Amino acid sequence: AVVGVVGPNGAGKTTLFRLLTGKEKPDAGAVKLGETVKFSYVDQERSALPAGKNLWEAITDGLDRVMLGKKEVNSRAYVASFNFTGPDQQKPVDSLSGGERNRAHMARMMRDPGNVLLLDEPTNDLDIHTLRALELGLANYAGCCIVISHDRWFLDRLCTHILAFEGESVARYFEGNW
C-alpha cells in the first residue's frame, strides 16, 4: 500500500511522521506500532548522508553488491539508476546540489531494510528522470509507503489510499487517490 498524506501547511503532516518514529512524543494518548514495523525515513532536510564520503560510498556503504529486498544487485548499477553515472559517483557528498542530495537520500533509503517507508515531500528538487526512478522504485517496493506531498500528480500515480488533514484536528482516510 502507498498512503498519500495531504493537507495545508501546519496541519500536522510532518508531526505525524515525527510521532511515528519516536522523534516527538504525543501530547495525549499513545502511539502503538506492530512489533515488526521498521521505518526508513527521509525527512525534508535530507541531512543524513555521511560526511567525508563520496556519493557511491554514502549510498552503498562501499559495497560492490547491495541487497534490494531479497535481490542482490551491482552497487554501481544501482547508483546509476538514480542518474548518478561515471564520475558523478565519486563526488564528495558535501558538494552535492539540493536535487543530487535528494536523489542520494532516495537511493540510500530504498536499499534500507525497513518495511515502511516514510517520505516527507520526496519530489522536491527532483528532475523528471529521478522522479520516474522514484516512482518505479516505490511501485516495486515490497513494504508499505507513507508519502507526504503537495504534488497531486505524483500522488495520483502511486497512492492506494489518502489520509487528508483538513484542519481543526480533522483528518479523513479513504481508499483510492485524488
Predicted ranges, named:
Residues 1-178:
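ABC ATP-binding cassette signature C-motif
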